Amino acid sequence: MQSLLSLQDISYAYHNLKGETPALSHISFEVSQGEFLAIVGPSGCGKSTLLSIIAGLLKPEEGNLYYNGNCITGCEPNDAMKIGYMLQRDHLFEWRTIYQNVILGLELNHSLTQQNRDYVLQLLKDYELYAFKDKKPSELSGGMRQRAALIRTMATHPDLLLLDEPFSALDSQTRLNVSADIAHIIRKTNKTAILITHDLSEAITLADRVLVLSKRPATVKCEMPIQFSVERHNPMEVRNTAEYQLYFKHLWEVLTNEQSVFQST
């Protein structure tokens, strides 16, 4: 598969009056077109920092990033880089309705066509938010707000999705169903996605490959390709397979030396 994104020797440190705190150290990996990559690692190891660098929100102190073969280090996202970034918090505007929130990216991109309006309305129906499209965010539960934020991310048709623990606000059952649905949509539309998560089960169930980071300053500790003999649309069926148990055991053993507690659902 063709590489959509390539990181080469990326390093980054935070600076303040007391000195610097190294966050990332010589990170290198590639993400292929249509691949779903999950990144796990100890809390505070720099996973979100890495995602911010990919999104162009932070500039690495060392190394380069390439998108479709073009160097994008320090560049702001443009039309050639169709990146959708979903943060841990929903960041919905309380004075706008849910529909007005999910079309915000289309408005900013001057691409609010009738076709895109119809696409957004279909997403609202698919995620059971159509009946709430005229409601304000304060009238929705945390899980519903997070689904609205995800629709806002998908509305601009990004080629690369950056997902920073997007399901963390959902209850366990909803999280299982929504995460499986999103992964199915991403694969069906051949989107490329990078998921940051603390949940090893989620990483194994959703991803084509899991990248494990060490404690700060983070380095790539290992990579694990993920394959199952069953369809992934049913998360509980996947978690009952022998492959899942082996992947989980191996990841847990790799992370044991990092002395970090991970969530398992």
What are these model-predicted stretches?
Residues K136-L140, M144:
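Conserved ABC ATPase signature
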Residues A155-D159:
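A short, proline-enriched helix->beta-strand linker immediately N-terminal to the Walker B motif
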Residues I72-R89, L108, P235-T241:
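ABC ATPase NBD coupling module
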Residues Q114-F132, H184:
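Conserved ABC ATPase "signature" region
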Residues A55:
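Helix-to-loop junction immediately C-terminal to a conserved catalytic motif
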Residues G63-G74:
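Conserved ABC transporter NBD signature motif
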Residues V40-P42:
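The feature captures the beta-strand-to-loop junction immediately N-terminal to the Walker
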